[in-house]
Amino acid sequence: MTSSRSRRAARLGGAALAAALLAATQATTALAAPGNPGAPRFSAGAPSLGDPYFPDQGNGGYDVRHYDVTFSYDPATKVMDATTVITAVATQDLDQFDLDFRGPEITSLKVGKHPADFRRDGQELVVTPRPKLKTGETFTVTVTYAGTPPVITDPDESIEGWVPTDDGAFVPGEPQGAPAWLPSNDSPTDKATFTFRATVPEGVTVVGNGRLVSKTTAKGRTTFVWDSAEPMATYLATVTLGNFTVNETTTPSGIPVYTAVDPRLEAQSAAAVARIPDILEFFSSIFGPYPYNQAGAIIDRAPDVGYALESQTKPIFSSAPSVGTMAHELAHQWYGDSVSVAKWSDIWLNEGFATYATWLWTEHTGGATAQQTFDSSSNYGRAATSSFWQVVTADPGPEDMFGNVPYNRGAMTLHALRGKIGDTAFFTLIKDWAAQHRYGNASTADFIQAAEKVSGKDLKAFFDVWLFQKGKPASW
């Protein structure tokens, strides 16, 4: 993600966290059938996965495998009519489970072929399946809903979710915007494949993740079908729609590139769009193979949003991007999208990597070297008294997770590590990191372990200074 200001203040408090943890504890208490110890032990899935920054996010008891989302949307009325079919596998015997959903009114909900009881409690959609679900059972949840999806406003006044534009909608999801329009298990750790079937007035273009399977027009309405074949976290899903100029090309190595640009931004965006193939080729040479079956970008006019987001396969931009911003968001396809955080406090692994990738791209194209950028007044050249040095890189807190520290100090950490272990070990490390955790999740602890393994060095003191301590590092 790139932004002109810090995003996403805390949405939690001690009471909320305690309540979530208590509910999770209660949910794990199950009773066996009397006199039959081998019988299923039905219980409610946990209503939270316990992330310290966003304790309401995610749910336990099942693993989502696929989302199939069918919807119609009219930009004139801002009304969505949608049906989402979730395919999941129960990871425990379930008599109740939660989904995350803040969207429009639900008109129908089924588990399998059977209507299910449900209630809404804030973000939680609490479902009681009939019959109950056994461990290992594959099941579907079909949710039908209609109305206007909400814009989610964070305490820092940045917005996400379903953001109407003058010709459609801009749809960013990080860190908790997907439930505005998508009933889901909204956690970075529960990745799934996606299919989107979107019907809009003729002349409107819908751009989703993955590849365009079909586009058909009849009776003044056009249906777009997008398929995302590789696993994706919900916050990376998008179905941004509006008036776009579409261009399709390929990189020299054959990666399909699909770009959709608001015609009002074509001239300002031309330089960044033209460099997409070159950026992808360069990053593939140092990070390893591009992890998806399509690349691209969506450049829209959404002035109230004010940031770009690394939506999987096609980053979304709320204004015309610079080449550097384009490089940052494309780097996320490896670091952030394919390899995602284990918990939100690990955000430096996303933003630090993408920022450092931009330093490498700048050097590659004849600009400042990575060392010069490290030394600059925006980075290590900041005064030791700057408040910048008072945020912990590996635990910035929800109020600073999209501030400068995970980005800039995260990138500085990587450059300092490169100097510590040498170029050969460093570039082996970051390529192995992308390969070993492809389509998965990883933590700061995982990265430290990987760095020590590749380098053969004890790096505890190094990472303590750069990741876990406040203050400007003086030596490492």
Which role fits each region the language model picked out?
Residues 2-17, 27-81, 164-167:
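N-terminal, polar/Ser/Thr-rich
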Residues 81-104, 182-186, 192-201, 445-449:
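Surface-exposed beta-strand/loop patches in extracellular or lumenal glycoproteins
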Residues 84-86, 137-151, 194-202, 224-230:
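Short, hydrophobic/aromatic-enriched beta-strand segments in well-ordered soluble domains
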Residues 101-163:
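A surface-exposed beta-strand-loop module
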Residues 135, 145-194:
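Glycine/proline-rich low-complexity spacer/linker segments in large multi-domain proteins
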Residues 187-327:
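Hydrophobic helix-coil surface modules that form long, contiguous segments used
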Residues 313-373:
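Zinc-dependent metallopeptidase catalytic helix centered on the HExxH motif
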Residues 403-476:
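Amphipathic alpha-helical substructures
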